[in-house]
Amino acid sequence: MNVTTQGRTRHFRTVTFDRAQNAVRLIEQRLLPHEFKIVATPNFRATAAAITDMVVRGAGAIGATAAYGLAQGALAFRGNDLKKFYVHVETVYQVLKNARPTAVDPVNAMNDVRRHMSPGQTVAERQFLALAAAEEFAREDVRHCEAIGRHGARLIRNGMKILTHCNAGWLAFVDIGTATAPLYAAQVQGKKFHVFCDETRPRSQGATLTAWELAQQNISHQIIADNAAGHLMQRGEVDLVIVGSDRTLGRTGEVANKIGTYTKAVLAARHKIPFYVAIPLSTIDWNLKRGFDIPIEERSESEVLGAWGMVDKSKFKTQNSKLKQRAYVRVANPTSGARNPGFDVTPPELITGIITPVGVLKPQELWPRRRELGFSGQGG
């Protein structure tokens, strides 16, 4: 996606790989929208930490990061012993797999890398195949998002007001995004519409990331408090809801996504507003049979009890230079604790359709069309 920074417009991808340095290059998303910065992780443990600490986040982006991280770890191995190489790669795999448990993209991405590297007869061959597979996963992520945009743009009409939740934009994928892909495609088609970005507490990824993306692309939008969505729906000010997903169950059509998605789905159903989920094929979990079994990440209570932001110097009389920096501010009662589940699960009966690279499907169509959607296993 094109980004204008320091008066210059350039095309960036969220995740890339530096072969010369054997490093994964990432947009430091925790600094947005106040600062645009590229960072490099020099080894697979640093790459896993970047996923855990949310330097990079979003289903496709952490999938590509994990794929590159596995290749990075494989390339760091020194020696020719295939058995020792296998043990090393398995260690790398487990470290990256445990970085964030709810999203399935990292597991699917790394399984793909392992599958493609296995025919290699030597360590060097497997290292080469690992990086080639990671690069192909990243390219496929972009192709899937492009297809989602084409299919999803048909849902958007002139004058629509569209609600989205959290960030399922290009920052959450290698490029383009899922929930935002129909918006970008519709904009290219000349359609005029307005987007409401849920702030998406506690990390405010709608307010910081989605709003920043839409501003970069000159798309009409406003940030709303999470609790305002129902009011706007009740007043007829929302025509369509499009969200992303961190894990969608192929057998049931249940969708795990950022906390608050289920609430928006309930509200949309109450007000008869179409509710769509946009996903690449790598987000589909073909193994789990019920949403209750999806591991829900519990994050630090500090995210709920306070917030990061840029200090507004206009509110202070002092010219202290420290006020130019980002700061964490506690807003909650100092003696209270908090619960911070990062995700919730939306049942299929609340979902109008799932926008996939092969078309817009009903949740119950995923399993019958599993071969077309990339399922390669057995069972029913």
Model-assigned labels for residue ranges:
Residues 2-45:
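Positively charged, low-complexity intrinsically disordered leader regions
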Residues 6-23, 87, 94-161, 279, ...:
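C-terminal binding/interaction regions
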Residues 31-33, 70, 169-170, 247-250:
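A short, flexible beta-alpha/helix-coil linker loop
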Residues 35-46, 158, 235-243:
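Acidic-glycine-rich active-site phosphate/pyrophosphate-binding loop
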Residues 38-44, 169-173, 250-257:
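Short, glycine-rich nucleotide/cofactor-binding loops
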Residues 49-56, 263-266:
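Small-aliphatic-rich amphipathic alpha-helix that forms the alpha element of a beta-alpha
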Residues 53-224:
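N-terminal active-site beta-alpha-beta segment that forms phosphate/nucleotide-binding
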Residues 192-193, 198-377:
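Conserved phosphate- and dinucleotide-binding cores of soluble alpha/beta proteins
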